[in-house]
Amino acid sequence: SFVSRGLGDVYKRQPTSLVKLENLSNHLGGAQIWAKIVSEANGGAHKIYNATVHALICKAMGKKYIVGDTGAGYAGKMLSMAAKKFGLRCKIFMGIKDIRRQKPNCDAIRKNGAEIVPVYTGSQTLVDAVSECMRYWVSNCDTTHMCVGSTVGPNIFVKICGWSTAQISRELKTQLKNEFKKIPKKLKLINCVGGGSSAYG
């Protein structure tokens, strides 16, 4: 786990909080409504979990370069943070349209020492950034590891993303047991879906 590697409190600020939304619960009546504040994770998003696992894999393989894709910029920002933490050289592939829309995250990526590679092909958004990133990785896989930011691409990358992001669920199970003594039988989980990484987790 992240904690056993000594990365928990310092690097991930885990576990992220589980808080009861008292006013909303009272307003709707009946059900208790809780929220897991994953935005407390270092960098402001759950993407740090996947980025950290891939950085550790890259180090374990003896590779010095890591590449990744990003759309809104969070996956790229987190990977640039993880790369900086573990002394890796980093390239982030990003559609030119997304670069124009996501200046704050692009600034953060560059501040962490990573290079943003603009993608001008196709829709000039995430789907093409993923494709260009994979093309680059296939041509440089002897020296470079690839981190896929969402549950897309070859099966192993989907599994790594799902396993690492399941840190959300691992924390949640412990927090529910601490709060209710057991996991409630009538429990409904609601999560947004974009690329699928947090939903998988």
Sequence positions of predicted segments:
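Helix-rich "cap/lid" substructures immediately adjacent to catalytic or cofactor-binding pockets
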Residues: 20-65
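A short, small-residue-rich loop immediately preceding and capping a beta-strand
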Residues: 42, 58-82, 86-95, 185-198
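General beta-strand structural signal in soluble alpha/beta enzymes
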Residues: 14, 33-37, 67-68, 117-119, ...
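Gly-rich Lys/Arg/Thr-decorated short loops/hinges at beta-loop-alpha junctions or inter-strand turns
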Residues: 4, 29-40, 58, 111, ...
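Small/polar-residue-rich loop-to-helix segments that shape phosphate-bearing ligand pockets
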Residues: 91-183
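Single conserved hydrophobic/aromatic residue that forms the stacking wall/gate
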Residues: 1-7, 11
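Short, structured coil segments at secondary-structure junctions
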Residues: 6, 86, 112-113
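Buried hydrophobic positions in well-ordered alpha/beta secondary-structure cores of metabolic enzymes
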Residues: 17, 35, 47, 54, ...
